Amino acid sequence: MRKIKTITYLFFVILLLSGCETTQSVRLNLEENLLSPETRLMTDNGPVIGFIDQLGVKKWLGIPFAEPPISELRWRAPIKINNWKTLKEVNSFSPPCTQFQSSLTADGLVKPGDIIGNEDCLYLNVYAPSSSKNKLENNNELLPVMVWIHGGGNTTGMPSEYNPEIFVKTENIIFVSMSYRLGFFGWLSHPLIREQSGLNASSNFGLLDQIMAVQWVKNNIQFFGGNPNNITIFGESAGGQDVIALYTSPIAKGLFERAISQSGGTSVT
């Protein structure tokens, strides 16, 4: 009986994956933003170059912070991204994590319920004001950092839906947004998963993605002009709920100094 249930379960998994491995979101900003030498810098993982928008905001869009959670890494805790040597151009959003199209943001090209996104989606985006400087020796001159966790019921949503340019420019902060696994891929609880060891058995893969993203920020944000000792995480709705989870998680201890939960709540048992 267990074998039959397992085969049935795998059948539905394959059916779902066949429709989402390569699907792209039509809302991605695929316009080629001109690379700017001023945004070239070295991270712990390798060199990147971004661009400067019309408001003078520096942007690095689509920086990988974990290995793609595909194949044998599907339904596993995220793994640190491998280092790269060649200059990585990060001037456009990565595909969002696989999800069903929300009725709130559907347009003429996609319908509610359509599968959009890609499993290879663990990327983050960094925004900095024109005044930011790379890795200053005096941490007092580094800027405050705010890390955004988007809402959407942990089933939908993507960083490209939020535009922090004015916020960054007027408040003189470093802003970071991230993608994390959603729905079926981020929160699946199943006996076969619970048989795994360590964090692989948690089923909270979306939260683990968020923690790894904040860890990446902690390790690298100084290169973008941000203060690694002045990080605030904040999120709205399900993102606010996730903020509370990170605030109480021992795994995330020491990664940030402040937390803001906007219209998010959770229960503790």
Question: Predicted segments — roles?
Answer:
Residues 240-252:
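Short glycine-enriched nucleophile-adjacent loop
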Residues 1-8:
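Bacterial N-terminal signal peptides that target proteins for export
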Residues 224-236:
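Alpha/beta-hydrolase fold nucleophile elbow
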Residues 121, 199-222:
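Alpha/beta-hydrolase active-site loop
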Residues 2, 21-204:
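Non-catalytic accessory segments of hydrolases
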Residues 151-152, 205-209, 237-240:
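Active-site loop->helix "elbow" adjoining a glycine-rich segment at hydrolase catalytic centers
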Residues 253-266:
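A conserved short beta-strand
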Residues 16-19:
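C-terminal motif of bacterial Sec signal peptides marking the signal peptidase cleavage site
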